[in-house]
Amino acid sequence: MMIKRWKYFSEDELRCKGTGEIKMNEEFMTKLIELREKLNQPMIITSGYRSEEHNNSIGGSYKSAHIRGLAVDVGCSGAKAYNIVKLAMELGFQGIGINQHGPHEKRFIHLDTMTSEVIGVSRPWIWSYK
């Protein structure tokens, strides 16, 4: 299978940590690249595509956008996290999850483009973890 290479993001960042598969949605990745270009700073992806099995094994939601290739978690904190959230809202990301608790190296912002029709709840939606 030919793997699409995405500007700014490595295969290792995007692949499922359980199976090694990469099944990112092309429209989602186009929007993520646009965010990265507007941010004008590197973005470290800590979680990209997840198989259903891997998602279940880490306690992910059965409706997770990660299993559809429509989400990433970006490792960031402080002003960078703020700027990512601001740009994500401007660019129309539908799901923004904020985890800014604990050590800085564990903090992240979840970004997804899953719509109300897919998940069955109102979108856009912003939430915090913990």
Feature map (PLM): residue ranges:
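Amphipathic alpha-helical interface surfaces
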Residues: 28-31, 41, 54, 70, ...
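Compositionally biased, low-complexity repeat tracts
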Residues: 14-16, 44, 55, 65, ...
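Generic alpha-helical scaffold signal
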Residues: 22-29, 48, 52, 68, ...
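Catalytic cores and adjacent binding grooves of peptidoglycan-active enzymes
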Residues: 63, 68, 72, 76-130
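Extracytoplasmic cell-surface/polysaccharide-interacting catalytic and binding patches
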Residues: 1-38, 115, 126-130
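Solvent-exposed, flexible loop/coil residues
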Residues: 13, 26, 53, 58, ...
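Extended, low-complexity, intrinsically disordered C-terminal regulatory tails
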Residues: 33-59
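Feature targets compositionally biased, intrinsically disordered low-complexity regions
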Residues: 17, 47, 59, 94-96, ...
